[in-house]
């Protein structure tokens, strides 16, 4: 500090005093953060350069790595896995207490042995995914990659078969994954009812669609059929480009020609007999016509009629009216009656020319936000829009190459950086490879979940809101880059905004 003494002891003047003050002020400003850290401790954790976690590709596993990264980018799915984990731990505690005569002290031996052998677990795939995905969404200060084999081994154990080493499809893998998760959840519900009624979270991917026909002439509806869905399947049109919203709208309707509408046929018979004043109708036929009047106002257009009524309608031919010739156009509608919390859209790009399959290069224009409608089908046959639901884009899986080969990669939206730790010692760890320390050695890394977490939004996330992940290769990406993947977008992952 001699330089400060020299300055202060030199002949004084107004200018020198001012200069001295400025120098001291600047020095204090520079060292103040260090002094604060020494006295009060570091109140902020420095982020600096950071990255996320990649997945190791064993050879042709890009369909697995991209699918898992896509799911990891959805906060609601992560929350669902955590809630299932809590249910499993509560069940385990309950069983342990019952076995020990309600002793509140829980021995971890059973827990660890069960988790080591996924086949003995109530929900092995849930546990494997929880372990892996919590590692994937963690933030690292150096390049880090882990193996997806914890999930692969669990699936192979469940299905008792090996996953093919050949090129596979990301959509098919994701569908199998979701179906298996739902089956595990159903078993967990049944099992928990036997022990204690626990609050099992709703499966966030579950939606429901209804298919039915609408006659363009009589406006009658067919009997609707309902289907549980996990992924929205869309056929990409064979054209240069199209908006996702238009594909969704077109997917809900299809025109069918030459359809034999039962209601139109019955009404034609009744009108014709009234015009003829029921000439030459026998008493039995009059009774039959009375029965038809009930069907004409209440029945669906595809009603399964009693045999004798069906035969009368089919064979009716009087004067210039032959019922078999009455045909018209109907609209085949496929509407959503229950929208999921997490919407996965599969853009099917397969085209068949009668001989071979090829890849459809149509540019599908999609946005970071979409709004979908949910409908209600009343018993009266009316269709009403129930509500509109907004979704935000969280992940995109793209595919480059041909129909039969190529490469999958994922864009995953960044989440907030979280600080803080939570004990995760009861859960299995995914093998990790630290590329800067040892590229050839796998080691176990303990995942640090977040208890009393502090959240911080990184400035760079505003400019580069997405991770671009190709197996172990990771870099940041802008929103415009993601939205420009119109030619290669294969699966879109949206999360519900308003619940």
Curated annotation (Swiss-Prot):
Q: Where is the active site?
A: 62, 407
Sorted UniProt keywords: Hydrolase, Protease, Thiol protease, Ubl conjugation pathway
Q: Name one Pfam family in it.
A: UCH
Spell out the PROSITE patterns in the cross-references.
Answer: USP_1, USP_2, USP_3
Q: What is its EC number?
A: 3.4.19.12
Gene3D superfamilies attached here? Cysteine proteinases
Q: Which GO terms describe its cellular component?
A: mitochondrial outer membrane; mitochondrion
Q: Which reaction does it catalyse?
A: Thiol-dependent hydrolysis of ester, thioester, amide, peptide and isopeptide bonds formed by the C-terminal Gly of ubiquitin (a 76-residue protein attached to proteins as an intracellular targeting signal)
Name the residues that span the membrane. Answer: none
Instruction: State the Gene Ontology terms under molecular function.
Output: cysteine-type deubiquitinase activity
InterPro entries xref list: Papain-like_cys_pep_sf, Peptidase_C19, Peptidase_C19_UCH, USP_CS, USP_dom
Q: Which cysteines are joined by disulfide bonds?
A: none
Q: Which GO terms describe its biological process?
A: protein deubiquitination; proteolysis
Q: Taking every annotated instance into account, which residue ranges of this chain make up the domain USP?
A: 53-497
The keyword Signal is annotated on this UniProt entry: no
Top enzyme category: hydrolase
**Leftover remarks:** Present with 450 molecules/cell in log phase SD medium.
The UniProt entry's sequence similarity note says: Belongs to the peptidase C19 family.
The identity of this protein, by name, is: Ubiquitin carboxyl-terminal hydrolase 16
Q: State the organism named in the record.
A: Saccharomyces cerevisiae (strain ATCC 204508 / S288c) (Baker's yeast)
């Amino acid at each position: 500090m001699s330089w400060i003494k020299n300055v202060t002891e030199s002949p004084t003047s107004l200018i020198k005093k001012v200069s001295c003050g400025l120098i001291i002020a600047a020095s204090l400003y520079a060292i103040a953060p260090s002094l604060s850290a020494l006295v009060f401790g570091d109140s902020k954790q420095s982020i600096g350069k950071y990255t996320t976690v990649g997945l190791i590709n064993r050879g042709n596993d890009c369909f697995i790595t991209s699918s898992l990264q896509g799911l990891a980018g959805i906060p609601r799915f992560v929350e669902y896995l955590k809630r299932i984990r809590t249910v499993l731990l509560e069940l385990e505690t309950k069983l342990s207490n019952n076995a020990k005569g309600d002793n509140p002290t829980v021995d971890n031996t059973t827990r660890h042995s069960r988790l080591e052998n996924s086949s003995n677990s109530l929900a092995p795939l849930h546990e494997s995914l929880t372990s892996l995905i919590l590692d994937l969404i963690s933030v690292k200060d150096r390049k880090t990659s882990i193996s997806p084999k914890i999930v692969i081994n669990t699936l192979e154990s469940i299905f008792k078969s090996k996953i093919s080493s050949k090129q596979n499809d990301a959509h098919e893998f994701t569908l199998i994954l979701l179906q298996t998760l739902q089956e595990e959840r159903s078993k967990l519900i049944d099992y928990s009812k036997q022990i204690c009624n626990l609050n099992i979270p709703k499966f966030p991917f579950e939606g429901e669609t209804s298919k039915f026909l609408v006659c363009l002439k009589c406006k009658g509806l067919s009997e609707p059929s309902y289907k549980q869905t996990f992924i929205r399947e869309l056929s990409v049109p064979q054209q240069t480009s199209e908006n996702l919203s238009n594909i969704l709208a077109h997917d809900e309707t299809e025109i069918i020609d030459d359809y034999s509408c039962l209601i139109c046929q019955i009404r034609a018979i009744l009108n014709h007999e009234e015009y003829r004043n029921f000439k030459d109708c026998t008493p039995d036929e009059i009774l039959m016509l009375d029965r038809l009047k009930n069907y004409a106002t209440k029945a669906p257009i595809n009603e399964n009629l009693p045999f004798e009524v069906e035969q009368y309608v089919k064979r009716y031919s009087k004067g210039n009216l032959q019922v078999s010739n009455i045909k018209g156009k109907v609209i085949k509608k496929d509407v959503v009656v229950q929208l999921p919390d997490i919407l996965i859209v599969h853009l099917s790009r397969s085209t068949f020319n009668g001989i071979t399959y090829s890849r459809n290069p149509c540019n599908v224009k999609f946005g970071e936000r979409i709004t979908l409608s949910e409908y209600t089908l009343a018993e009266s046959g009316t269709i009403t829009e129930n509500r509109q639901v907004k979704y935000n884009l969280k992940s995109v899986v793209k595919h480059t190459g041909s129909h039969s080969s190529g490469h999958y990669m994922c864009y995953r939206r960044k989440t907030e950086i979280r600080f803080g730790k939570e004990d995760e010692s009861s859960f299995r760890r995914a093998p990790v490879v630290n590329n800067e320390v040892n590229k050839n050695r796998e080691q176990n890394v303990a995942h640090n979940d977040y208890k009393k977490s502090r959240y911080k939004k990184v400035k760079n996330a505003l400019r580069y809101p997405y991770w671009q992940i190709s197996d172990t290769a990771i870099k940041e990406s802008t929103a415009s880059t993601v939205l420009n993947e119109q030619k290669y977008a294969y699966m879109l992952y949206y999360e519900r905004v308003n619940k």
